[in-house]
């Protein structure tokens, strides 16, 4: 017989976003026993458990931590607040009425009727199948995150001679990690004319170890039938098409793919929340509320982040908003994404989070996060209220691999006669 539970707040995912959201909700008046975290893995912490390198926590804790240390701090806070959680619990669906259906070995099939839901499912890696690389399907082709888990958690070495396709942060970090474990990383090839990772990771993970980064290059063939024996990489033109005659062959037994992250939003679609075509995450308002009232989103399920500190900050915002919603404190509009002020991304800005602002519901200062679509040097981030420019901040360098942000003040959005706020990149 199906088990039924009732909770004020259900959080899908027990990673850094889910934990921070749960803690914030409990610290903002929601009784801990009315919160439930559902995590499909066997432990809390999410992706951080396999990120054993340092560099986490500089913004949140003002000190440098490893991934597991950072996760442990939030896990300890959640446990100190006695927030309930279920491990090994796979969520199957979320209805627009906020009924969560899940299954676990311990509880079997069960449903949770929730007052509010926070989506914190994180993201997944883009696979080889999305790349259409010619060749057989030999052993030795891994996503960078899978290789990271094998090396850091399972104690297995994927290979000894490595080529990496893609220069996302996970790929850069795994170039260093594989080198430290004794492998030879021959090259990191990147399709775009710029790296997809943070500048500090390029320096610390590639430059410091003498690993070459070839921009505007991609893998055009994987050699080997049973096991990878080598790969061919080629330069690409400005339309990202391989250029004949530029082929280079590298003998290797392992190819790691770091070719992008995709927010994990199958449950979001099932709940009826619209997704952004740019981020592949849900469209949200100033409270990080999706198009379905009472369902909120935060972390990498919303848009892919560089820093976990920003994930925690965003998740805390969602936790506070969900607690306020459950307790009846939010001033409801007809629909979460209707009315209000529309945020527009123009002139090199690919998207903004949030997309809609209702000034009556926003905090005193709202952080708007975004990414640019190319490399910009000595340019300006500008914010327009209608046709009036109200912010104009110079940035030495902006790149797609590094998230940017602007701050909007609630006081500036009261009694206004415009219905759009535009975030753009300008030359001067």
Regions found by a protein language model. Give the residues of each.
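Short, aromatic- and glycine-rich surface loops/edge beta-strands on solvent-exposed regions
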Residues: 381, 408-428
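Surface beta-strand/loop "capping" patches
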Residues: 331-376
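FAD-site-proximal beta/loop scaffold in flavoenzymes
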Residues: 119, 141-151, 254-305
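A Rossmann-like FAD-binding core segment of flavoenzymes
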Residues: 73-102, 112, 179-266, 364-396
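Predominantly flavin-linked oxidoreductase catalytic cores and closely associated redox partners
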Residues: 109-110, 116-213, 218-227, 294-297, ...
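A conserved FAD-binding loop/helix module that cradles the flavin
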Residues: 298-345
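Beta1-alpha1 glycine-rich phosphate/pyrophosphate-binding loop at the start
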Residues: 9-73, 77, 149, 158-202, ...
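FAD-binding core/adjacent interface of flavoenzyme oxidoreductases
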Residues: 1-12, 31, 72-161, 238-245, ...
